[in-house]
């Protein structure tokens, strides 16, 4: 008889765990929401061109940083395709904008070619990259992103037009929460995803037909999926079995 395993939460981590444990264990997957997937959520939008699968959460990945996810997609025979990922900034009140497409997007506004402030900003980009890598190699006493930006005297222009809006966009955070982000976690994520490399970027991929494609593929392999079942507590019994009251 197989040992029973309960997995709480059917986001990408819960689904992948259930998929890889299903052959060795009697897996039960519990989800408080009406459907599985969590952050991996796809909405179908209809227009005059037909149906379009739009992801509202997890959208892109790359092979160097997501080898296990790529392996999961390959095991499921779920196709994926190349995609673009870029960052754009637009200050509407001042009609100031640029994007990370090098070199044209960097100078999307022609007036930036003769802007001393903007050229100093570009210099700060390279200084940020250098200091970030130095900090990762030899962490000091700085604990938050705010500490780092203040200690190295980065300009308000650099903070407000690059690092803070980009960080806020990545993690869906407010500017204040981005400032308080743990420094090493912030820099390590940027380094791992080659965001500190200003020119050479990894080739990004996206799941064909949206992330719901792999959510559905995993669910087709699972027998015991319990949606609308919120787990309220987990307690060990003397026999070391796990008791999971739910409703």
Regions of interest found by a model, annotated:
Residues 9, 82-84, 227-229, 235:
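Short loop/edge segments at beta-strand edges and connector loops
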Residues 63-188:
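Mobile amphipathic helical/loop "lid" adjacent to a hydrophobic cofactor/ligand pocket
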Residues 3-29:
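N-terminal Rossmann-like FAD-binding beta1-loop-alpha1 element of flavoenzymes
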Residues 230-247:
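Conserved beta-strand-loop-beta-strand element in the redox core of flavoprotein oxidoreductases
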Residues 22-46:
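Glycine-rich FAD pyrophosphate-binding loop
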Residues 43-69:
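N-terminal glycine-rich dinucleotide-binding loop that anchors FAD/FMN and/or NAD(P) in oxidoreductases
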Residues 186-234:
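Helical element adjacent to the flavin cofactor pocket in flavoenzyme catalytic cores
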Residues 22-26, 219-224, 245:
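Short glycine/proline-enriched coil/turn segments at helix->beta-strand junctions
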């Amino acid at each position: 008889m197989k040992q029973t395993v309960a997995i709480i939460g059917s986001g990408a981590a819960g689904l992948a765990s259930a998929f890889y444990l299903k052959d060795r264990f009697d897996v039960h997957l519990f989800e408080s929401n009406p459907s599985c997937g969590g952050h991996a959520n796809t909405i179908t939008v209809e227009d005059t061109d037909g149906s379009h699968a739009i992801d509202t959460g997890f959208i892109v990945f790359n092979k160097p940083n997501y080898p296990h996810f790529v392996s999961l997609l390959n095991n499921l025979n779920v196709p994926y395709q190349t995609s673009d990922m870029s960052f754009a900034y637009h200050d509407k009140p001042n009609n100031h904008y640029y994007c990370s497409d090098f070199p044209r997007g960097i100078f999307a506004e022609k007036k930036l070619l003769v802007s001393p402030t903007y050229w100093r900003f570009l210099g700060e980009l390279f200084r940020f990259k250098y200091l970030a890598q130095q900090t990762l190699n030899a962490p000091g006493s700085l604990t938050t992103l705010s500490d780092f930006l203040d200690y190295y005297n980065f300009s308000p222009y650099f903070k407000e037009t690059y690092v803070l809006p980009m960080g806020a966009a990545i993690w869906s955070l407010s500017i204040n929460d981005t400032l308080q982000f743990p420094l090493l976690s912030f820099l390590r994520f940027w380094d791992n995803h080659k965001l500190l490399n200003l020119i050479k970027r990894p080739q990004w991929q996206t799941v064909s037909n949206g992330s719901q494609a792999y959510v559905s593929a995993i669910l087709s392999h699972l027998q015991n999926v319990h949606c609308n079942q919120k787990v309220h507590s987990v307690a060990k019994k003397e026999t070391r079995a796990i008791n999971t009251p739910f409703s």
